From Swiss-Prot:
Residues 354-365, 397-407 have a biased composition (Basic and acidic residues). Pfam families: DUF1609 (PF07753), DUF3654 (PF12376). Residues 408-417 have a biased composition (Acidic residues). The lineage of its organism: Eukaryota, Fungi, Fungi incertae sedis, Microsporidia, Unikaryonidae. Residues 354-438 are annotated as: Disordered. It comes from the Eukaryota. It comes from Encephalitozoon cuniculi (strain GB-M1) (Microsporidian parasite). This is UPF0329 protein ECU11_2090. Belongs to the UPF0329 family.
Length: 634
């Protein structure tokens, strides 16, 4: 949802360059300011978005993401209580909470209205300052256990929304009256067309103000945030969902940091995200299932898009499929336990039978010994008796050996619990070997290896190839694409299971072009010529005919291309823009060496994997740097 992002950026431009811009040159000034901010020219889609905002404003509804981030980790999760926060992070968290009520208020009422933003922002601050809740000690409220375990962070957020709702009517009245006054005060010097546009915009502001005065709108804002908090709490319970969610939060913080020129803020406020209140509430009412709402929130947040009907149905289908698989696993687990119980009972019966047989054999052996001692008077008979006893003892010995052999045979079979564990271990080991094979050994498709070549050769191959979207590209375009696609060194990170799991999140599998596909995604920063771009490192994989995992897509996707929906859309989406994958030659990359001269240098630690690409002719010159960042701690 590029619109969400651009609303923030346009607001940030006002913060960095001053909110008062000469209205006759406002559009050009805004574009120039944004280009200075991005250190590049705006794309056509970005210019279109800025023009749309400048012409139509932004009245979209918003929600607050109930998570506090500090540096590269989550320090307060949705369900966190004050006692759960690490002691060294509490001072930072308390400072965030002191600013939280103001942020909540802005998320409830902020709108972007070109040429009118100054007086609206002044009004937002004025009403917020007039409110009595502003003087409450929110830190003490969060700390207070009240004889129990204390409130969760989502409870604190919801409480602030409810308290701030009392100010909505006052703000709505002032906003509506202010818009009406400005309609009456429009200068006569405006052309008919300019006057019409100004009246239309101010009329929208007036209607918005009146809407805020209604009880229905006030309830909607509070209810939507409550649903958002519950959804985030639900997301946090599933590890894979939590990882994706926090990676997207981290990505947005990185973008803000880069746009500020790397200037660190003392405190980073929780994120505000544009989300359709009506769709959120109606989905919750219709399905009465927080799993569905949580899946919907996760999907639209990590894919950074507006809620559409198709997203709701996708969330419903995902939850149903997940529950079906969980039920299957539960059924298999019950079946396994039943089989284990039956084997235990069988083993117990065998043990009882063995003990009874041993007792009978022992009793029989004692009886033979007594009968052998009765004829001990005569030497001949004694001699015969001794012979008989010897033979009898020999028989007894054989019987005991047989018993020991039988018993030894049973002992050779592990006790049932050990057998079950052993069998499970063997199965686990087998599946583990398969998993290691998938995660450690990849083949790389020729469409990925192509980007190692020079731009001219790449262009020739693409023009002669089967992928229509790559045909007839200019050399300049190919060179730009090479910067984000020629990153095959990432394979070194992928082969190390421990590191790979620390940096990359795996997305769900999907079918396309008769092949099963999935992605691995990590946050990254690409630096070149003093410019930094935040984005995602994407790895696209499919299952080869021999069951091996083949990397068919590898690139760094800058945030601006992801948010404008270009080049395949969101990194986390279950789709890609590769329609067909030809059965071309793949390589496992073992033994690969670049031509003479240093091409790149790789360094890593627990938090980042860094690749520096150097000029082969002058190895001291760094051409570009790709830094892959660890999944944030949660």
């Amino acid at each position: 949802m590029m619109r969400t992002w651009m609303v923030y950026v346009v607001g940030l431009v006002g913060e960095l360059y001053g909110s008062q811009v000469e209205e006759t040159r406002e559009m050009r000034e805004m574009k120039e300011a944004l280009e200075r901010l991005f250190s590049r020219r705006l794309s056509d889609s970005e210019i279109e978005m800025v023009e749309s905002l400048e012409n139509g404003g932004n009245f979209e509804t918003r929600v607050l993401v109930p998570v506090i981030f500090h540096k590269d980790k989550v320090v307060v999760s949705p369900a966190a209580r004050y006692r759960d926060i690490e002691k060294e992070e509490r001072v930072y968290v308390e400072e965030v909470i002191r600013r939280l009520r103001s942020l909540v208020w802005h998320s409830m009422v902020y709108i972007y209205v070109p040429k009118n933003n100054d007086w609206i922002m002044d009004l937002i601050c004025k009403v917020s300052g007039m409110s009595s809740p502003q003087r409450l000690d929110d830190v003490a409220l969060y700390k207070d256990t009240g004889g129990n375990c204390g409130m969760k962070f989502v409870d604190l957020v919801n409480k602030m929304f409810k308290q701030n709702a009392d100010m909505l009517k006052k703000f709505g009245d002032l906003l509506s009256n202010g818009a009406e006054t400005r309609i009456l005060e429009l200068p006569d010097s405006l052309s008919e067309d300019e006057r019409r546009r100004e009246v239309e915009m101010l009329q929208r502001v007036k209607e918005y103000g009146k809407m805020l005065c209604t009880e229905d709108k006030q309830k909607e804002i509070v209810e939507a945030q409550k649903i958002m908090c519950d959804a985030c709490e639900q997301i946090w319970r599933r590890e894979e969902d939590r990882k994706e969610f926090t990676m997207e939060i981290y990505s947005r913080y990185l973008n803000m940091k880069v746009m500020r020129g790397g200037v660190e803020r003392d405190v980073e406020d929780p994120l505000i995200d544009h989300m359709d209140h009506y769709m959120l509430i109606s989905t919750h009412k219709k399905y009465k299932c927080m799993d569905v709402v949580a899946e919907l929130v996760r999907k639209v947040f990590v894919e950074d898009k507006d809620i559409e009907d198709s997203d709701v149905m996708s969330a419903v289908c995902s939850v149903r499929e997940r529950k079906r698989l969980e039920e299957m696993r539960e059924m298999e687990e019950r079946k396994r336990k039943e089989e284990e119980r039956a084997k235990n009972e069988e083993e117990l019966l065998r043990m009882v039978e063995r003990e009874e047989r041993e007792k009978r054999e022992e009793s029989k052996g004692r009886g033979k010994k007594k009968r052998g001692n009765r004829g001990a008077g005569e030497s001949k008979e004694e001699s015969k008796g001794r012979g008989k006893r010897k033979r009898g003892n020999k028989g007894a010995g054989e019987s005991k050996e047989e018993d020991r052999g039988e018993e030894g045979g049973v002992e050779a079979e592990d006790p049932l619990e050990e057998m079950a564990v052993g069998e499970a271990w063997r199965k686990k080991k087998g599946s583990g070997e398969k998993r290691i094979s998938e995660e450690h050994h990849y083949k790389v498709h020729s469409r990925v290896l192509r980007w190692k070549k020079d731009a001219g050769e790449i262009k020739r191959e693409l023009d002669e190839g089967y992928e229509k979207k790559w045909k007839n590209r200019s050399i300049e375009e190919i060179k730009e694409q090479k910067k984000v696609h020629d990153i095959v060194e990432v394979m070194k990170l992928l082969r190390d299971k421990e590191k790979c799991d620390r940096f990359f999140v795996r997305t769900g599998k999907y079918m396309k072009g008769k092949s099963e596909r999935w992605k691995m995604v990590a946050n990254g920063i690409l630096e070149e010529g003093g410019e930094k771009k935040v984005g995602k490192v994407e790895v696209g994989l499919f299952k080869g005919e021999g069951g091996e995992s083949v990397v068919y897509h590898l690139m760094f996707r800058p945030t601006e291309t992801e948010r404008t929906g270009r080049v395949g859309g969101s990194s986390f989406g279950k789709y890609d823009d590769v329609d067909e994958i030809k059965k071309e030659k793949s390589s496992d990359m073992f033994g690969f060496r670049y031509p003479s001269g240093v091409r790149c240098e790789m360094t890593s630690n627990r938090n980042e994997f860094r690749i520096e690409y150097r000029n082969r002719k002058n190895t001291s010159e760094v051409l570009r740097t790709l830094t892959i960042l660890r999944i944030p701690e949660t």
